[in-house]
Regions:
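Phosphopantetheine-dependent thiolation modules in NRPS/PKS and related acyl-activating systems
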Residues: 2-81
Length: 81
């Protein structure tokens, strides 16, 4: 029996994971704003990326996410549906 492929990320899951990482409510994290302005740093980006690689099979690199730290910019890079 073949292993089940990982579930794709959604914009809401990305938002929820970022909010969890920052100790915030997802409703307080806008999808179109720079996440650095909300306290996201490189260590947290790496932690999120490793989690998404493990749980969702994401292949994006750190530099891709660091270049434009906003959920709406990350969604296509992370294969969000």
């Amino acid at each position: 029996m073949a292993p089940t492929p990982p579930a794709p990320l959604t914009v809401e899951k990305i938002r929820a994971d970022v909010a969890d990482c920052l100790g915030e409510d997802p409703a307080d994290i806008p999808v179109d704003e720079n996440l650095v302005d909300h306290g996201l740093d490189s260590v947290r980006v790496m932690a999120l990326l490793e989690r998404w690689r493990r749980e969702h099979g994401v292949t994006a690199g750190f530099a891709d996410l660091a270049e434009r730290p906003a959920i709406e910019a990350w969604a296509p890079l992370l294969g969000a549906v």
